[in-house]
Amino acid sequence: AGHLVHMPAHIYIRTGKYHEGTLANIRAVKSDEEYINQCNQQGFYPLSYYPHNYHFLWATATLEGDSKTAIDAALKTSQKPPDSMMSVCGYETLQHFAAIPLYAFVTFGKWNEILEFEKPKDDRPYIVAIWHYARSMAHIAKNNLTQAEVEIVNLESFRNNETIDSLLIWGFNSAGILVDISCEVAQGE
């Protein structure tokens, strides 16, 4: 039921009604939590649909400029998928969920939080690449240009990475393209 409660947010985000999208996702999270707890739901639904409500809440709250709600949702998005599932075929999107706090911290200029963020496991190259991106942005903002350059070089090393290029978010968005965009943004700064 939570997924149906969430779906209007797709319309709201496309029509600029970001706050309504935020409210729809808050209701969807509550609905899914009740459903998962009552039914002891396992499998695809709690791994993907439920965290997608938080993921979309991050997006709508970001677009309406609500940093507190956006960052809280980003952190919850990253906490929902179990680490053991991130490399399972078909569940690669969970790696993107784990990177969402880094995107949120960059968006809202939370430079100290980025620099305190623990380095992801090396067997998650997409998340590690985004970690280097976020760190490069933090160092640029703090005018630590030598350290920023080191992070950009590290980030660039993830371009044309077969593992990242083959990781598809929701089955159609290439994580490799997101890494390419991150490289361009960091270089542009």
Feature roles, as predicted:
Residues 140-143, 148-151, 175-189:
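C-terminal substrate/ligand-recognition segments
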Residues 7, 14, 56, 100, ...:
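"A position-specific structural signal for the A-helix of alpha-solenoid helical repeats
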Residues 1-4, 8-14, 18-35:
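Hydrophobic, small-residue-rich alpha-helical packing segments that form membrane-like cores
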Residues 2-5, 44-47, 51, 95, ...:
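Start-of-helix signal in alpha-solenoid helical-repeat scaffolds, especially tetratricopeptide repeats
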Residues 1, 43-44, 78-89, 117-126, ...:
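Solenoid-like repeat scaffolds
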Residues 20-31, 65-80, 109-122, 145-160:
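Alpha-helical repeat scaffolds
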